[in-house]
C-alpha cells in the first residue's frame, strides 16, 4: 500500500453534531439542525449560554477536506473497472468497497487492489471464511 502524499495536519474544528434548539425539551422537535429564524430567538442572536450554530468558521481546510485519517481521499468501488481507475493515484486516493458487492467478488477486488498497490479502507469487511 502506498503512503499518502504529505499534507497539512487534519483538524476537525467541531466533531459534535449540531442539535436543533429545544430538541432536548420537546419530543416532537427532532434533533436535525434547523436554522433559527424567529425575531426574538436567543440562538439566532448568539446569546451567551445557548447552543452554537454551524457557521463557515467550523469548515475544514480546503486541502484536507474529505480526507480520511490516513491522508487518502476515499473512492467507492463496485467492480474491477472502478478499481483500475485508481492505479495512477495510489498516494492520494484509497478504495472503499461498496456494500452491495458480494463476498466472492470482494475477494477478487482485494487481490487486484493488492497487486495494483491500492489501499482499501474496508479490507476486512464481509470476507468469506472459505475463500
From Swiss-Prot:
GO biological process, one term: translation
Alphabetically ordered keywords of this record: Ribonucleoprotein, Ribosomal protein
Protein name: Large ribosomal subunit protein eL32
Organism: Candida glabrata (strain ATCC 2001 / BCRC 20586 / JCM 3761 / NBRC 0622 / NRRL Y-65 / CBS 138) (Yeast)
MF terms (GO), sorted A to Z: structural constituent of ribosome
Gene that encodes the chain: RPL32
Similarity annotation: Belongs to the eukaryotic ribosomal protein eL32 family.
CDD domains, sorted: Ribosomal_L32_L32e
Residues forming coiled coils: none
